[in-house]
Amino acid sequence: MAATEIIIERTPQARPAAMTGATKPTLIGQTREEMGEMLREIGVADKQVRMRVAQLWNWIYVRGVSDFDQMTNVAKDMREKLKAHFTIARPEIVEEQVSNDGTRKWLLRYPPRGAGRPVEVECVYIPEEGRGTLCVSSQVGCTLTCTFCHTGTQKLVRNLTAEEVLSQLLLARDRLGDFPDRDAPVGAMVPNEGRKITNMVMMGMGEPLYNFEEVKKALLIASDGDGLSLSKRRITLSTSGVVPEIYRTGDEIGVMLAISLHAVRDELRDLLVPINKKYPLKDLIEACRNYPGLSNARRITFEYVMLKDVNDSLEDAKGLIQLLKGIPSKINLIPFNPWPGTNYQCSDWDQIMKFADFINSAGYASPIRTPRGRDILAACGQLKSESERMRKTERLAYEAMMIVGHGEDD
């Protein structure tokens, strides 16, 4: 096997552009209406507000600037007023890692916002043929305690704000040269033509539907046609099954849906994904059947981690087909990623192939996720912030296998 090549960049502990603006309100993550009200509060005349909001929206989300002084068509006195009252700074980059397969991972630090100390989250970029996918976090930590997932062993610290969700996308586009007049980074692979980030998945740290309002606001801004302009068919929200908010996601956001399923019987899913005790399979599947716009072109993705002698029998495969009957679906099979202290093992490869063949023969797409970014510890079920993570020499990182292939091509 070829030697692994990893680039690690550590930023200084104090980054003035990120940290000094942290005490000011941010314009990132605000709706147009909220941004307009913020401008009125600093004395912008009503007759100018709509024009100023349009200017700011374009500079922040189309041009990707993070400094008011770069807004060259905004009068200097207005730029000074904006600088005095607001920020559009990016979060602090604690660490950036680049895998030899092009996978990139950023450890980002945000201000406390009531958490008592600064908090850290990770986001991951996966380049593929003709597309690039960004995996975004929605919470610091997680409440779900799924027994096979190492990320779930980190206690929930707090929800991320809409600005903090969006800033992961903005920062990644900065680092990838994905805004106009920006150069792509030298070295690891990124798509040569078109946008570097074509797809976005809410599959990082946390349960996004336990932070519904902020995630909703962030995704509606990310898909706004006059800004970041990501197609809703290229945004996937992954949930462990918060049923009431699945209905709201379809009605109020309209992005693609992925379900962390992992079992076809309530008694087993109660163990693997404890939220099932509150929202059992019957209710979850009913919500999926009623998700708006389902078709062969807009399928729900069901994630299924392969656990040896737990959920990998052909009887489980038959149960999976029966459970999803009539739902336009894609079933992602994920080889389990062992981590120190877990009692689970990955299914044997032959068994995974038999399981996949059975699913495929029933007419369902059933890709087996292959590891990406394992050399930079960026893989499925392993995202964990620096203060809570295991020693790197002990960690097996495979989160990225879960990320790739989500969303539909327009």
Curated annotation (Swiss-Prot):
Gene Ontology MF: a single term: tRNA binding
Entry-linked Pfam families: Radical_SAM, RlmN_N
Required cofactor(s): [4Fe-4S] cluster
One Gene Ontology term from the biological process aspect of the record: rRNA base methylation
Disulfide bonds: C135-C380
Record function comment: Specifically methylates position 2 of adenine 2503 in 23S rRNA and position 2 of adenine 37 in tRNAs. m2A2503 modification seems to play a crucial role in the proofreading step occurring at the peptidyl transferase center and thus would serve to optimize ribosomal fidelity.
Domain of life: Bacteria
InterPro entries, A to Z: Aldolase_TIM (IPR013785), Methyltransferase_A (IPR040072), RlmN_N (IPR048641), RNA_MTrfase_RlmN (IPR027492), rRNA_lsu_MTrfase_RlmN/Cfr (IPR004383), rSAM (IPR007197)
Residues holding S-adenosyl-L-methionine: G206, E207, S238, S260, L261, H262, N337
Miscellaneous note of the record: Reaction proceeds by a ping-pong mechanism involving intermediate methylation of a conserved cysteine residue.
Cofactor: how and how many bound: Binds 1 [4Fe-4S] cluster. The cluster is coordinated with 3 cysteines and an exchangeable S-adenosyl-L-methionine.
Domain Radical SAM core as annotated: residue spans: 128-377
Catalytic activity reported: adenosine(2503) in 23S rRNA + 2 reduced [2Fe-2S]-[ferredoxin] + 2 S-adenosyl-L-methionine = 2-methyladenosine(2503) in 23S rRNA + 5'-deoxyadenosine + L-methionine + 2 oxidized [2Fe-2S]-[ferredoxin] + S-adenosyl-L-homocysteine; adenosine(37) in tRNA + 2 reduced [2Fe-2S]-[ferredoxin] + 2 S-adenosyl-L-methionine = 2-methyladenosine(37) in tRNA + 5'-deoxyadenosine + L-methionine + 2 oxidized [2Fe-2S]-[ferredoxin] + S-adenosyl-L-homocysteine
Localization per record: Cytoplasm
Residues involved in [4Fe-4S] cluster binding: C142, C146, C149
Record EC number: 2.1.1.192
Name this protein carries in UniProt: Dual-specificity RNA methyltransferase RlmN
Family (UniProt): Belongs to the radical SAM superfamily. RlmN family.
Organism of derivation: Allorhizobium ampelinum (strain ATCC BAA-846 / DSM 112012 / S4)
Keywords: 4Fe-4S, Cytoplasm, Disulfide bond, Iron, Iron-sulfur, Metal-binding, Methyltransferase, rRNA processing, S-adenosyl-L-methionine, Transferase, tRNA processing
GO cellular component: cytoplasm
Residues the record marks as active site: E122 (proton acceptor), C380 (s-methylcysteine intermediate)
Enzyme class (EC, first level): transferase
